[in-house]
């Protein structure tokens, strides 16, 4: 709202830049806090948001610098609320990001909806409602959550297929009936289709269920943003940007598949969705319900310490079971696909049943390695081996997308004795087509377009495909009713990585993908292929021993002082000049010694495990402490003493998911 008074008003404005400060501008109209304006910043026009307002008579002394005029008013009413400002302050402080860039994160761009525009809500079968029936266990859990007065944070800890989603949907129905707002977090955009499809058939409220993510048109995002800001009752489904909506009546937060690493933003601001959800839960006194068959170790530890109410779901919603689980030691197998797995797939085909093959790698084969000198052909921009992709007949870097022709000889010793080591999804596809020429086979991974992936998934659901091969995407949220055989290839991928979460990742991935085969039928067969059958994460996943894995992993982390027993901050220095990155990393460390205390441990300075990515050399320091405030003080105080240059970029990650 703009009030027309003839006077001069001063405004502190947030601009989308990586600085944690506001900037003074003036205007001759009384503008509302929270609206967007156009300003001149360092010679270029930028959009800013008014955060504070001052009257001319509030300043007794004149400014020592010239204050520029606001160029243009963009909004007639505020686009953000006090809640958005509070949240941005909290995130920027916690993640060491600029206040302005944090405030703008998730905000729809300035665009206007078309006249009479309607939102793309779920409207395929608007008159159809499938009655959502809960079993006794689900009904008791549902009543416990909505009836609890003292406890507001819950975790549904149940094996895949135990019926967590049905409880989530029932909770959505309850809070919509109370005219409240619901935030439904999912780990990937691709899962939105599955979740929405299930809600659609359970509730006749298609006009109250929306997606909010980077794929949604900007005009639609503006409409959803305003609906939330105006207090309309709805369910909004999204990943990270959805957390920034201007909620006013938020009473339920759902976090499906809480363990997924995609909830952590790897771009500025580098927050974790779980941490912001806790902030929102306290702010709105909402219920926060997480769920997973494989909780993150941090969540499990919090449940163990009674910081989160653990609700164990004992029963499987579909009452299915796994008939047989086998581990195949691939050291004794000559082929990519073991004879045991091939036999099981053929048997499934004979019974008109389907097979799901999971492989933890993209690409056709992995590294191109010289048998003479052992040299691995790497990306010239990154310290990472190039991977062969058959469709393009090229070597591709999965970090910076560098492409080159396949090599005929070793660039190190000129030997022609070079071979591809290990294998990927495209080779598995080729092998299956060779052994089973009459089977209908498809694969889904991130090398294929989204439309092609969705088409393959739909065909598999409709039993038009016999064998579906996939990478990580098939471990996340899909329910296939006609599976007989599940094959897991390369179960131990990641085992040798120098990363404290590698064991947890392997256990989680195996447990989740095994759950895909155990939902509907009661004669499923799972075959796990590995060269390390005794590795603890594989062993516990194979035996379905969840609690035992978590206890052993906690013991390992405690001995190493890693999370959840310590807070961790990783600082990466990257530059196209290796010496510059190295020097700045060491300079930061030397300056930080002034603030190092006994309670703070450090690793480094050292080269990052992935030393070079996209032509940038990387050096890092890792700080650990039980007290986050000590780490926060150390980083902020050291930053003040270190002069940064345009040739070295610093990344501060307050909660690193990976140390690679």
UniProtKB/Swiss-Prot annotation:
Its cofactor is Zn(2+). GO terms for biological process: DNA recombination; DNA replication initiation; DNA replication, synthesis of primer; double-strand break repair. Residues 405-557 form the Helicase C-terminal domain. GO terms for molecular function: 3'-5' DNA helicase activity; ATP binding; ATP hydrolysis activity; DNA binding; zinc ion binding. One of its GO terms (cellular component) is primosome complex. Component of the replication restart primosome. Gene3D superfamilies: P-loop containing nucleotide triphosphate hydrolases, PriA, 3(prime) DNA-binding domain. Zn(2+) 2 binds at residues 379, 382, 397, 400. Transmembrane segments: none annotated. Residues 145-313 form the Helicase ATP-binding domain. Initiates the restart of stalled replication forks, which reloads the replicative helicase on sites other than the origin of replication. Recognizes and binds to abandoned replication forks and remodels them to uncover a helicase loading site. Promotes assembly of the primosome at these replication forks. Zn(2+) 1 binds at residues 370, 373, 410, 413. This is Replication restart protein PriA. Belongs to the helicase family. PriA subfamily. A motif (DEAH box) lies at residues 256-259. It comes from Borreliella burgdorferi (strain ATCC 35210 / DSM 4680 / CIP 102532 / B31). It catalyses: Couples ATP hydrolysis with the unwinding of duplex DNA by translocating in the 3'-5' direction; ATP + H2O = ADP + phosphate + H(+). Keywords: ATP-binding, DNA replication, DNA-binding, Helicase, Hydrolase, Isomerase, Metal-binding, Nucleotide-binding, Primosome, Zinc. Binds 2 zinc ions per subunit. Its EC number is 5.6.2.4. ATP binds at residues 158-165.
């Amino acid at each position: 709202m703009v009030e027309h008074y003839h006077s001069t008003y001063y405004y502190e404005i947030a601009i989308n830049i990586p600085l944690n400060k506001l900037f003074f501008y003036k205007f001759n109209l009384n503008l509302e806090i929270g609206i967007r304006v156009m300003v001149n910043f360092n010679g270029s026009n930028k959009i800013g948001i008014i955060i504070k307002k001052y009257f001319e008579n509030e300043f007794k002394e004149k400014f020592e610098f010239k204050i520029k005029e606001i160029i243009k008013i963009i909004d007639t009413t505020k686009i953000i609320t006090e809640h958005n400002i509070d949240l941005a302050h909290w995130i920027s402080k916690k993640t060491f990001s600029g206040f302005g860039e944090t405030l703008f994160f998730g905000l729809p761009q300035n665009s206007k909806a078309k006249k009479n525009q309607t939102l793309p809500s779920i409207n395929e079968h608007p008159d159809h409602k499938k009655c959502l029936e809960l079993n006794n266990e689900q009904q008791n859990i549902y009543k416990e959550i909505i009836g609890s007065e003292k406890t507001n944070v819950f975790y549904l800890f149940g094996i895949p297929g135990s019926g967590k989603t049905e409880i989530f949907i029932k909770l959505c129905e309850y809070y919509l009936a109370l005219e409240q707002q619901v935030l439904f977090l999912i780990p990937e955009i691709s899962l939105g289709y599955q979740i929405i499809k299930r809600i659609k058939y359970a509730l006749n409220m298609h006009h109250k269920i929306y997606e909010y993510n980077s794929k949604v048109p900007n005009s639609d995002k503006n409409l959803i943003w305003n609906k939330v800001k105006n207090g309309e009752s709805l369910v909004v489904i999204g990943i990270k940007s959805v957390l920034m909506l201007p909620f006013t009546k938020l009473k339920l937060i759902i976090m499906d598949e809480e363990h997924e690493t995609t909830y952590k933003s790897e771009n500025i601001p580098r927050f974790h969705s779980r941490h912001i959800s806790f902030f929102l839960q306290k702010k709105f006194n909402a219920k926060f319900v997480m769920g997973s068959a494989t909780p993150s170790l941090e969540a499990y530890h919090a449940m163990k310490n009674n910081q989160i109410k653990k609700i164990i779901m004992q029963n499987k919603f579909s009452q299915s079971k796994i008939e047989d689980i086998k581990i195949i030691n691939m050291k004794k197998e000559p082929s990519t696909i073991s004879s045991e797995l091939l036999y099981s797939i053929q048997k499934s085909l004979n019974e008109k049943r389907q097979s799901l093959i999971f492989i933890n790698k993209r690409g056709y084969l992995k590294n191109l390695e010289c048998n003479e000198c052992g040299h691995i052909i790497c990306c010239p921009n990154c310290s990472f081996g190039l991977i062969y992709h058959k469709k393009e007949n090229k070597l591709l870097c999965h970090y910076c997308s560098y492409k080159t022709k396949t090599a005929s000889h070793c660039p190190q010793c000129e030997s022609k004795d070079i071979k591809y080591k290990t294998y990927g999804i495209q080779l598995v596809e080729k092998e299956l087509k060779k052994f089973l020429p009459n089977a209908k086979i498809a694969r889904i991974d991130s090398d294929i377009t989204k439309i092609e992936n969705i088409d393959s998934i739909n065909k598999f659901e409709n039993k038009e495909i016999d064998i579906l091969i996939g990478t990580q995407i098939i471990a996340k949220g899909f329910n296939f009713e006609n599976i007989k055989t599940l094959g897991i290839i390369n179960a131990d991928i990641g085992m040798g990585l120098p990363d404290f979460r590698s064991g947890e990742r392997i256990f989680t991935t195996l447990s989740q993908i095994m759950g895909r085969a155990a939902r509907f039928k009661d004669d499923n067969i799972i075959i796990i292929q590995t060269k390390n059958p005794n590795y603890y994460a594989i062993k516990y996943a194979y035996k379905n021993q969840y609690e035992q894995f978590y206890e052993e992993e906690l013991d390992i982390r405690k001995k190493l002082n890693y999370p959840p027993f310590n807070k961790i901050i990783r600082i990466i220095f990257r530059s196209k000049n290796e010496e510059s990155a190295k020097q700045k990393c060491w300079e930061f460390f030397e300056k930080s010694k002034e603030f190092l205390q006994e309670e703070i441990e450090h690793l480094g300075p050292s080269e990052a495990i992935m030393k070079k990515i996209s032509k940038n050399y990387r050096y890092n320091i890792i700080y650990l402490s039980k007290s986050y405030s000590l780490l926060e003080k150390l980083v902020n105080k050291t930053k003040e003493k270190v002069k940064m240059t345009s040739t070295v970029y610093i990344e501060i990650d307050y909660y690193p998911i990976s140390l690679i």
